[in-house]
């Protein structure tokens, strides 16, 4: 029989007491009252914060948006099919945040920065809140460096600077995404990190964009954030803020970034859907009252930082879709008033074969002219004036039959200037070539070239400049202006090329 020694028992009890670790964990737990349409009403989460992440028992994550007297209205970031009345909900005490860092470059992510490209997990230790306050006045510097898009019509007449917000607006199928993608492609040698945010688009469209970027080597400096049309409205609402947070990380590390939100109309629609289901009162066009703040707090995060903060920048190109060219609708007017200018794409111009279909008359850049390089300023002023006069005369010429010679000359030149602004998709131009083309157009070198041969002439002239007059490009790139030497080389080059071209026509 085993004898029990009292001292041994007391030792065991003492050891057990020493090892006992009492941890009291207080959980804020609630119960689902009602669930459906991506919305859950939860009872019992007294300590919930606005925007706090909630864990539902089936693994779905939600965000507390409505804090009411007796319940919390939460939006779900999943389908929530297994949720039912009585399911438990825990508050996490956290606000939505995402991983950030260099490891994200070249990846395709969802609205919570989780990879969806099948290339494995993202290894990064840093995180950033999805919603962050925008830089204050003292933390900013005015825009002064150019953000070249490589599109002649934009860089000459509607210039964009680093840190600017420039809206791209137009009807469906007018080439809005094409302008944005060309701008990304043009950053290849500029050391700019690009973030493309696709909101509410078909997965096939996003795949096409990713393929274009990959083929042309642009995915090496681009992050793609996609909330597809079949994703919950919550993710479509969050995607632009995720893109902004990723770009902000690089901006605060002294780098230059470009963010494209394609498009904010769909984000506003997703937010309207969430708000109406949460029973928030509808306003104009059934959008909630804070839809202006939805976009202003997003676009105000784009900035050019002061030297003390490293002079990084975040340039935003939001896209908004109009219905039948109506720029006076609610969302277009809101975003126009928030941004520093807009590029208006017209379906009439697009169908008439002018692509990119930029309507120079109502497109404007409020701060970009300060960032335009001197070489472009020297030639762009005349281009703008002549195109404006041409547009006026063209309307008048439809009714008048007998026009004097000066008017006919002006119409002929205007038609050729319009031709030089045509550009194929995915072929952005370096700034020195754009300057040369505009110089040739505004100084009368194209006046006797047949209109249908202008594109061919311009292409040949650019090739000739690259092959035989490389010094011109070097001078413009280094001096950032059209000096006497560069202008001399250009004049000779255009005259020589024109002679051989006209002989062959």
UniProtKB/Swiss-Prot annotation:
GO molecular function terms listed in the Swiss-Prot or TrEMBL record: ADP binding; ATP binding; proton-transporting ATP synthase activity, rotational mechanism
Catalyzed chemical reaction(s): ATP + H2O + 4 H(+)(in) = ADP + phosphate + 5 H(+)(out)
Membrane topology designation: Peripheral membrane protein
Subcellular localization(s) per the UniProt record: Cellular thylakoid membrane
Residues where ATP binds: 170-177
Superkingdom of origin organism: Bacteria
Cited InterPro entries: ATP_synth_asu-like_sf, ATP_synth_asu_C, ATP_synth_asu_C_sf, ATP_synth_F1_a_nt-bd_dom, ATP_synth_F1_asu, ATPase_a/bsu_AS, ATPase_F1/V1/A1_a/bsu_N, ATPase_F1/V1/A1_a/bsu_N_sf
Entry EC no(s): 7.1.2.2
Annotated site residue numbers, Required for activity: 363
Primary enzyme class: translocase
PROSITE patterns for the chain: ATPASE_ALPHA_BETA
Alphabetically ordered keywords of this record: ATP synthesis, ATP-binding, CF(1), Hydrogen ion transport, Ion transport, Membrane, Nucleotide-binding, Thylakoid, Translocase, Transport
UniProt cross-references to Pfam families, sorted A to Z: ATP-synt_ab, ATP-synt_ab_C, ATP-synt_ab_N
Any single GO CC term annotated in Swiss-Prot or TrEMBL for this entry: proton-transporting ATP synthase complex
Subunit structure: F-type ATPases have 2 components, CF(1) - the catalytic core - and CF(0) - the membrane proton channel. CF(1) has five subunits: alpha(3), beta(3), gamma(1), delta(1), epsilon(1). CF(0) has four main subunits: a(1), b(1), b'(1) and c(9-12).
Physiological role: Produces ATP from ADP in the presence of a proton gradient across the membrane. The alpha chain is a regulatory subunit.
Family label: Belongs to the ATPase alpha/beta chains family.
HAMAP family: ATP_synth_alpha_bact (MF_01346)
Name of the featured protein: ATP synthase subunit alpha 1
UniProt organism field: Acaryochloris marina (strain MBIC 11017)
